[in-house]
Design a protein with these regions (language model features):
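Bacterial N-terminal signal peptides
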Residues: 5-14
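Cysteine-nucleophile amide-bond enzymes
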Residues: 16-209
Length: 209
């Protein structure tokens, strides 16, 4: 009886533990953020019915022979973060990071896209969520970097929505843009992690949960 229980534990552990995905440079890592005002506002405006709702995306790279993520973050702008640090910023599902790795179906031009992304290192984070202002937010970094060999952007920009599902404007956005002295760019072209994660050009290669 004790032997049967032991075998059952082994099989349950094997079945319930999600392995770390095998990552390639250029894979896009999408994560659901931990609870914060900004994460809540992004998810409310861009989330889909299915879980998790992604609020951040970064680019997997190998930097100084270590696994890392090239990302645009409110703290530090466009920077390189250790992969573990990136995953630690995720919400948890079953105690594991709520993060998914996705890969381009067509990788033509990917090396040039990565070089382009590295060229943005040091730019400030784009709290205004507007294009062509010398700043970048997370999915904007991917949008600007990932291009086809003939220079076209791989991912489309769509009219941005900052409103919650009930049509209300979250206080986070109202207060943020009041501090910036800018109008909320509702309806202006832009990107977000949730839309990008559902782009048919990408396929899932693994998840941590």
């Amino acid at each position: 009886m004790r032997f049967i229980i032991y075998i059952g534990i082994i099989f349950c552990t094997a079945a319930c533990t999600s392995p770390t995905p095998e990552l390639h440079p250029g894979d896009l890592l999408f994560r659901a953020g931990r609870n914060s005002a900004m994460t809540g506002a992004i998810t409310a405006a861009t989330g889909r019915i299915e879980a998790p709702g992604f609020s951040h995306v970064g680019i997997f790279v190998r930097y100084d022979s270590t696994d890392a993520v090239l990302e645009a973050a409110p703290e530090g702008g466009v920077r390189i973060s250790p992969l573990r640090e990136f995953l630690d910023g995720s919400a948890r599902i079953g105690g594991r990071p709520a993060a998914v790795a996705m890969r381009l179906r067509d990788t033509a031009g990917l090396a040039a896209s990565l070089r382009r992304a590295f060229g943005f290192l040091g730019l400030p984070y784009d709290c205004s969520f507007r294009p062509d202002n010398g700043k970048l937010y997370c999915s904007e970094l991917v949008w600007e970097s990932y291009r086809t060999p003939d220079g076209r952007r791989r991912f489309p920009a769509r009219p941005m929505n900052f409103r919650a599902a009930d049509g209300s404007m979250p206080a986070f956005w109202t207060e943020l843009f009041e501090r910036l002295g800018e109008a909320i760019p509702e309806g202006e072209p832009g990107t977000n992690p949730n839309d990008m994660a559902h782009d048919p050009q990408l396929y899932e290669v693994g998840r941590w949960f």
